[in-house]
């Protein structure tokens, strides 16, 4: 699979302040890529440079083989951008907002109707096309934003916090459309999010902190490297349980009669559970989460940092 985004040795300075420091990463075509980081880490600077809004200090950035510095018009034609804050005209209808965007991209008049129908069908809003944007729910507005970002048929869609402020059901619907775009239209999705269950859906994740890439891999690989599953055991015979944990060389933390045991050595933990089952009053296994990954790497929880 070829890379549609290539960032090599990218640096961005503001005077003496280094916002992004010599980072490199790539995004494969047709994948969903999450770019995470605390506030001030360099995340927005990187995205704005990729979208041709900021100028680089050093390095190279390419989208679909086009240099974001020297081929701005070609890059802008290849990307769609959905910002966190709505930029739709609330007084205009869905259709009118999309037509205005077609004008910005010099889309031939003969193609406008076909494109509007196409993108509104993708987000299930064709029947609502005459409604004013101001009368729409938050979830519907996000779908219009996504439709507008697709009207010029980009190869890469940048989504900045696409589901922030939406209820869980609406968030699930928005993600259904995002996955549909990726799978059916082979559009590359580059997104930021502070919902870790969303990050785990992505094919690859990069975490930036202090202006440098501190992790870049699949969600599975990052969780395997930075988290541990844990068992929480309650017992009516603490002496017997502690003896077994020592026998099988398992570390634990105790609070009252509750024990937290690292589940990394699953075979040994299962032996303890089997031999102690008559005394176990409660048992819970908790999988490592991506919040744990972010905390381990950056020292901050994702909801505090992004």
Predicted features and spans:
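Conserved ABC ATPase signature
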Residues: 132-136
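ABC transporter nucleotide-binding domain
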Residues: 176-263
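Conserved ABC transporter NBD signature motif
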Residues: 59-67, 74-75
